[in-house]
């Protein structure tokens, strides 16, 4: 299956090591569409329940249950960029991030990666 930048996908992130985000969870594809078309791997950021986040950081983007197609209020963790094998780790596509919210994610990625 071909995925696009901004797709929300359910991903099996196990096994992990140390402080890496784990379990099966929603993730957002951040890799460009050309690379997604031709590469077996893709770049994702994991999403976690907003109630699990104790502090606000510039690398976190809040996602609304009602506006952003999430099962509950959540946080995109732009500080946890992962490269995954799309065929073996992605279970299914579950939604798509709004363009405005993707711009916020892009900004958080720029801050996290010092690309500003």
Where are these regions (language model features)?
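Conserved functional hotspots at enzyme active or ligand-binding sites that engage polyanionic ligands
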Residues: 1-116
């Amino acid at each position: 299956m071909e995925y696009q930048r901004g797709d929300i996908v359910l991903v099996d992130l196990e096994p992990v090591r140390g402080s890496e985000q784990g379990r099966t969870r929603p993730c957002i594809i951040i890799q460009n569409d050309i690379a997604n078309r031709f590469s077996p791997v893709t770049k994702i950021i994991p999403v976690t329940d907003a109630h699990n986040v104790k502090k606000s950081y510039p690398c976190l983007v809040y996602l609304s249950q009602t506006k952003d197609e999430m099962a509950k209020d959540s946080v995109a963790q732009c500080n946890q960029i992962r490269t995954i094998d799309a065929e073996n780790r992605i279970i299914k596509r579950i939604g798509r991030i709004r363009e405005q919210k993707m711009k916020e994610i892009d900004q958080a990625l720029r801050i996290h990666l010092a690309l500003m």
